[in-house]
Amino acid sequence: MKTETHNRQCIPLAISVLSLFINGVSSARQPPDRCNRVCGEISIPFPFGIGGKDCYLNPWYEVVCNSTNSVPFLSRINRELVNISLNGVVHIKAPVTSSGCSTGTSQPLTPPPLNVAGQGSPYFLTDKNLLVAVGCKFKAVMAGITSQITSCESSCNERNSSSQEGRNKICNGYKCCQTRIPEGQPQVISVDIEIPQGNNTTGEGGCRVAFLTSDKYSSLNVTEPEKFHGHGYAAVELGWFFDTSDSRDTQPISCKNASDTTPYTSDTRCSCSYGYFSGFSYRDCYCNSPGYKGNPFLPGGCVDVDECKLDIGRNQCKDQSCVNLPGWFDCQPKKPEQLKRVIQGVLIGSALLLFAFGIFGLYKFVQKRRKLIRMRKFFRRNGGMLLKQQLARKEGNVEMSRIFSSHELEKATDNFNKNRVLGQGGQGTVYKGMLVDGRIVAVKRSKAVDEDRVEEFINEVVVLAQINHRNIVKLLGCCLETEVPVLVYEFVPNGDLCKRLHDESDDYTMTWEVRLHIAIEIAGALSYLHSAASFPIYHRDIKTTNILLDERNRAKVSDFGTSRSVTIDQTHLTTQVAGTFGYVDPEYFQSSKFTEKSDVYSFGVVLVELLTGEKPSSRVRSEENRGLAAHFVEAVKENRVLDIVDDRIKDECNMDQVMSVANLARRCLNRKGKKRPNMREVSIELEMIRSSHYDSGIHIEDDDEEDDQAMELNFNDTWEVGATAPASMFNNASPTSDAEPLVPLRTW
C-alpha cells in the first residue's frame, strides 16, 4: 500500500518535470508569426518584439507601439526608439536640458536623468556619444548618481577660442562645445547646466542648451540654441547585449553552443563573442559574413548568401563556373557538356538575332520598294515624263524649272509639319520650308488633281517657271512624286496687301506714296504677263490677298492657280467662271469669255481699295452699293470722290495724283471691256501720274447711265455656283477680305 501511495505521489511530480522540459524546448522555437515586426517605419527584429511575452526575449526587450501615431517605445526605460541594429546598438531620443529659452528665467530646466539601470538590464551608454553645449557663458555637466563624469564650457568670447579654421571644424568653445564620454559609465546619467555667478540674471546670456547625442556637430551646422530647444530631444546611442548568467535568455537564440570557459564560440552560420561589463558576463552574436546574413538570435536565422549571383562570385570566377557552397562559393572549370550548352545558346541567340535583323531589313526593303513604285506611278500620272521632255527642249531654263524629289520637300517642311503652315485655301495648303542650300521657300501642296488636264498643267508650269520679273512671285519648281503635285515658290515674308491695308489692329499706316508705288508695281507685273512674256498669261484672280509684300513693301503678284496662258493670236479664253466676288469682271461672268481686260477690271477694284481703304464687299453699305466697285461708281456719278478717299491719307496725299488715279480706276471699271485701257496703258499712265506730268483736270469723265446700272454683280443676283475658292497662298494669316469667292476650276 505504501508503495502504491508513493507511486501516486510521484506522478504529479513527473508531470511537472515533463512540463518544465517541454516549456524549455518550446522556448527554443521561433517567435510566432502573429508578432508584429514593424512600428511606423521602424523595424523591430527579435530579440526585441511587440505584443505577447513570446514575441520578445525578456521584458527589457519589449517594445510598445503607440497606436495613435505609430511611435515605438522601449517599455522598461520609457524612451522613444529611433532604430535598432542587430550589431548590438539601439538609438533612442533623450530630452534636451535648457535655460533661458522660453520661460523668461535663466534657471535651468533639467529633464529626468537617463536611467537604463535595473536587474538584468542589457543597456549601457556607448563611447560614441558626446556631451554638447550650445549657447554663451555656461558649463554643461554630465553626472552620475554620486559624482560628475565630464563637462565642457561654451563662451561667446572669441579670445577664448582657437583660430577661425579650428572653429569651423569642431565645437571647441566658441558658441558651442563638445566632449566625448568615457567608457564604462554608470547606467543612470543626467545632464545639467551650470551658470557662473553674475550671469544668472533673467535673460543674461540668452538661450542655453546641453544634451547627450551620438550625432556629430560643428560650428558650421550648429545654429541658434533655440533650434535645439524647440526640437526638444537628441539621438543617444545605447549598446545592448545578452546576460549569459541567465540560461533562459541564452537558450532561445540560434548561436547557443557557448560556455563560460571559451572566449569565442562559432558554428557554421553564426558566432558569439564574450565579454564582461559591470561585473557580469555578456555575449554579442552575429552571422558569419560574407557567407551568411540574417538574424543570429533566431533558430536558423542566418541564411546562406548565394555569392554566384553577386559581383564577388562573377568577378572571381570569370570564365569558370561559380558553384555556391554553404557560407562561401567555389570556382570550378566548366564541364564539356556545360560548355557545349553555352556554345549552343550563343549560336541559337545569334541566329535568332540575325533572323530578326533579316526580317526587319526585308520589311524596310519592301516598304522602300513600295514607296518607290508609288512615287514612280504618281510621277507618270502627274506628267513627270512630259515635264522632263519640256525641260530638255529648254536647256537654258533648266535651273528655273527644277523638279524636286519628295524627300527634299519632306525634309524642307519637316514632313509637312502643321506648325509650318502659312495658309490654306480651296486649292491647297502652303507650308514654309528651307531647302538644303538655305533658301526659304513656300511649298504649296495641292488638294485635288485633274488627270484630264495633265498636259495643260505641265505646259503652264514650264511657262510660269520662265517668268522672271521682280514683281511676280517666282515659281522655282515642282514635285510630281506625290499623290498630288507640289509647287515650290519663292517665300515673301511680309504678308499680303489686304492685311496691311485693312487690318485696323496693325500699327502701320500705309502712306499714299507707298500705295501709288504698289499700284505701279502691280500694273507693271500684269503688263509683263499680258504682253512681254513668251505667251500672254491671264492671271484671272487679281485681288489684294494675292498681292504679297516683301520686307521693303515691294509688291509681288502671286497665286497663279487659276491663271491661263494663250497663244499670241488668241483674244480670249472660254472657261468655267472662276474668281472672287467683288473682283470678277461682269462681262466675263455673263459671257464666260476671259480677256486681258478682265484682269484690268480686277486691277481697277484694287486701285479703288488703295484709294478708299475699304474692302471690296461689305454688308455695311447699302444693298445696291454693297460692292466697292458700285459704291465707287456711284460716288463718281455724284461728284463726291473726295468723300470716300481714305481718311488716313487725306492730309498728306497729293490730291491731283489721287484724282488722276480715281479717273484711271473709273475707266478700268467700265462695264464694256473694249472701253477699258490695257495693262500697258495703265502702267504707263500710273508712271506719269507719279512723275506729276499728268494732268487729271480734277474732273472725272463718267460713262453713260446704262454702264452705271450694270457696273457690278450684286449679291441679290442668283448664281448657280458654289461658295468656295482659293485663299491667299503665302501670308501667315487667313484672308481678311470680305470678298466672297466663286468656285474655281479644279486646278493644281
UniProtKB/Swiss-Prot annotation:
Q: Which SMART domains match?
A: S_TKc
Gene Ontology cellular-component terms for this entry are: membrane; plant-type cell wall
* Biological process (GO), any one: cell surface receptor signaling pathway
User: What reaction gets catalysed by this protein?
Assistant: L-seryl-[protein] + ATP = O-phospho-L-seryl-[protein] + ADP + H(+); L-threonyl-[protein] + ATP = O-phospho-L-threonyl-[protein] + ADP + H(+)
Per the UniProt entry, the glycosylated residues are N66, N83, N160, N199, N200, N221, N257
S-S bridge residues: C272-C285, C308-C322, C317-C331
Region entry Atypical EGF-like: which residue ranges? 270-331
Stretch list, region Disordered: 727-748
At what positions is Phosphothreonine found? T575, T580
Q: What induces it?
A: Induced by INA.
Q: Which residues carry this modification: Phosphotyrosine?
A: Y489, Y588
The molecular function terms of the Gene Ontology recorded here are: ATP binding; calcium ion binding; polysaccharide binding; protein serine kinase activity; protein serine/threonine kinase activity
Instruction: Using the record's annotation, list all stretches that form the Protein kinase domain.
Output: 416-689
Residues forming the catalytic site: D541 (proton acceptor)
InterPro entries the record matches:
EGF_Ca-bd_CS, Kinase-like_dom_sf, Prot_kinase_dom, Ser-Thr/Tyr_kinase_cat_dom, Ser/Thr_kinase_AS, WAK, WAK-like, WAK_GUB
The yes or no answer to whether the keyword Nucleus is present is no
List the keywords (alphabetical). Answer: ATP-binding, Disulfide bond, Glycoprotein, Kinase, Membrane, Nucleotide-binding, Phosphoprotein, Serine/threonine-protein kinase, Signal, Transferase, Transmembrane, Transmembrane helix
Q: List the signal peptide residues.
A: 1-27
Sites where the protein binds ATP: L422, G423, Q424, G425, G426, Q427, G428, T429, V430, K444
Quote the function comment for this protein: Serine/threonine-protein kinase that may function as a signaling receptor of extracellular matrix component.
Q: Family per UniProt?
A: Belongs to the protein kinase superfamily. Ser/Thr protein kinase family.
Instruction: Please give the record's comment on domains.
Output: The EGF-like region is specific to this family of proteins and seems to consist of the C-terminal of an EGF-like domain fused to the N-terminal of another one.
| Protein name, as recorded | Wall-associated receptor kinase-like 2
Give the species.
Arabidopsis thaliana (Mouse-ear cress)
Taxon lineage: Eukaryota, Viridiplantae, Streptophyta, Embryophyta, Tracheophyta
